[in-house]
Amino acid sequence: MAIKIGINGFGRIGRIALRQALEIPEQFEVCAINYRNVDLEHMVYMMRYDSTFGRYGKKIIAKDNGLQFDDIFVPVFEGDSADTLPWGKTGAEYIVESTGAYKTYDRCKLHLDAGAKKVVITAPAKDKSPMFVMGVNNTDYRSDMDVVSNASCTTNCLAPLVKVINDKFGIIQGLMTTVHSATSKQKSVDARYAKDWRIGRAVFNNIIPSSTGAAKACGIVIPELAGKLTGMSLRIPTPDVSVVDLTARLATPTTYEAICAAVKEAAETNMKGIIDYCADDVVSTDFIGSDYTCNFDAKSGIMIGDDFVKLLAWYDNEWG
């Protein structure tokens, strides 16, 4: 039986979630979309043409206050507040919260008040709402948790890799840098950005140092690593795909070959479908559209001694 979902927000994540759900209708039924700035013809245009993922293959038209995809009709609403949305009437039970505006339990509870049963925040929560990363701590999920966070794209890449390394060798300390593709909040020319002045600099001709909460979030989903990891971000002028650079001091002496073997084993067993092990000469565009949250690059790691290692893992920061 298909899971009945509603999508709140129609930015990059909302549109990608819709694309993926429509590809597997036996698993997901999209009951409704809420888009505050609704213009159905523009929504059709944004779905049909995508600068990163290419032209959408299905027929799509605007029809009767909604979108028609071949034989699938999805109603579209224009609500400013989640508690005004008819989730209950449409049958939507699980809400993909992708606006970026609802990051706390109190805010997401408005979806529940409107008839939804569960809410998945597609970003780190701003409060203590439970955070889960598949392959890392998803077995801790309980059915009474009605608002959860799926963490960030970077955390979903970093945490599975960190778990494999920590479980096998132990991590004493770790530093992480994500070399991250541009995002929608960045500016095409120098402009004001109050929270982070450097993020306000032009995206096309700068490498921009910034912050990331991904390493700290690893300490939430893997509590024994709390306080042992920290990191930063370098924003670069590419449209999609990012790479995690993890440097760690290990508790157990080992070799780089043994580390690669541990990651490969995990990719074939308990992390299958989450980690992909790659030993080819790859570059960033090779991972556009990758379903894996963590694409381990076996050829790019380096090691000094038997306890100090640098590891690289790629991820599609939109699709993955």
Predicted regions span which residues?
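Alpha-helical scaffold segments in soluble metabolic enzymes
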Residues: I16, Q20, Y45, L110, ...
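A structural supersecondary motif
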Residues: P223-S233
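Glycine-rich beta-alpha junction loops
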Residues: R36-D39, A82, A125-K126, S152-T154, ...
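C-terminal active-site/capping subdomain that shapes the small-molecule cofactor and substrate pocket
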Residues: G231, V243, T247-G320
